[in-house]
Every structure is written in C-alpha cells, then in structure tokens.
Amino acid sequence: MTLYNEARANDGLGALYSAEDIYHYGSGENPYRYANVNMYSSDYIKKAYNRSDVTAEISGGNHRAHFYTNINYLRSNDVFKIGEAKHNGTNGLNIRGNVDLTLNDFITAYVNAKVSFYSRRSANGSYYWSAASTLRPNRISPLIPLSYIDANAASAWDLVANSNNIVDGKYFLAGTQSDMTNVFGDYYASGYSKATDRSFQFDAGVNIGLDKVLKGLSFHTRFSVDYSTAYI
C-alpha cells in the first residue's frame, strides 16, 4: 500500500491509503475489516487431492474363440475446501470388450461392445483461478462473523434471520457496493451442477468366404448400435 501511494504520488495523485489504514492492514488484528486474502492459502486450497484410475484387463481363448475385456474406473475430487466446491468430483466407469469367433474354415464372426458412464459434480462459479490472479487481497473478506454485527442493528439482524446463506451458523457472505458478488459467494451460495454422460456402442458381424463358389468371393454383414446421452 505504501508503494501504491508512492506510485500515485509519482503520477501527481493523492494517497489512497492513510498511514492508519496501512498500519491496520499490516497488523492483521481485524482481518474482516482490513482484509488480506491469499486465495492460494490452505484456508481455501488443499495441499493435495485424490485421483484414482484403475484398469483391469482380461483376455483368453482358444483356436475357436478369443476374447478381451478392459475395465476402467476413475474417481477424482478437487483442491477446494470451501462451499459447494469442496464436493467437486468426477466418477467414471468404462468397459470395453470383444469376442472373435472362428466357426469353421470359411465362417468367422465378431462382437465388439463398449459401455461408459461418467458423472461430474461442480460448484457454480468456475472462475476461481482467474479471480486469484486479479482480485486485490484487500478488496473483500470472504466471510464476516455474525458477532461483528451491532446488537442494536435490527434491520441487519432481520436480514440475517431471513437469509438462506448463513455459513456454519456464524458467518454471512461479504461484499461491498462495488463488489456485490465474488467467487467465494458463488461457491457458498450459487449451488452446484451435476452432469451425467452415458454411452453404449455395439457392433457384430459375420464374414463368409465363398471361394468354393467363386475364387475371391466373400460375404460380409454387420449390425451396430451407437447410443449416447448427456444431461445436467
């Protein structure tokens, strides 16, 4: 803030922050009035998050039939510790398989199939990292304790009593007249979205060699199904 005031002075402008303001921001004695928000701190971000990706493969067969199956399961969460974002996550199951058949010297057949299911949950408000790179640390305090409201401020307490966005029963969402919303408020009060993707693919075919009828002649037939759906 001192350097910011110096920069303004170099441009012929007055100081924006008083010496008293700079002292209070630096002391950290009241982080709600004199905010110093580090959006990369452990208050909001986990040190680590989990991601599991497990794959199993099964194969086998003999001279008549060969089969192969691949099963994959994916599960991951997110780095956030706040609001609905702490429940962000993805689950996915993917199964693929095929069977190749040799019925005799001139007839072969095959079956291929794939099934996948994915579900995702994410907090509404997906601009946390852009806000972290642009939001000034002293711009807002994400949450303010209810205890900071004057006991005689009846109108303020009426707002609290009728609000659905009291966090943990002791905080209300912060903001200013110039910043009436922010990513913290979105993560706590804007809810979440769930998306589901499902797909199924199947194809089967028969190949018949007709060399006994005419050299080089063959017959091929194929049947397939491709289904996909997604909804939020």
Question: What residue spans do the PLM features occupy?
Answer:
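A surface-exposed, glycine/aromatic-enriched loop/edge motif typical of exported proteins
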Residues: M1-I22, S116-L173, S228-I232
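Residues embedded in well-ordered regular secondary structure
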Residues: M1-I82
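Surface-exposed, low-hydrophobicity segments enriched in Gly/Pro/acidic/Ser residues
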Residues: L13, H24-G28, A153-A154, A189, ...
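Extracellular loop and loop/strand-boundary signature of outer-membrane beta-barrel proteins
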Residues: S41-Y44, V79-A85, N98, Y187-S193, ...
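Outer-membrane beta-barrel transmembrane strands
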Residues: K46-H66, I71-N72, N112-K114, A174-I232
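Transmembrane beta-barrel architecture of outer membranes
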Residues: D53, T90-R96
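Outer-membrane beta-barrel domain signature
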Residues: I71-Y73, D78-V79, G83-A85, I95-R96, ...
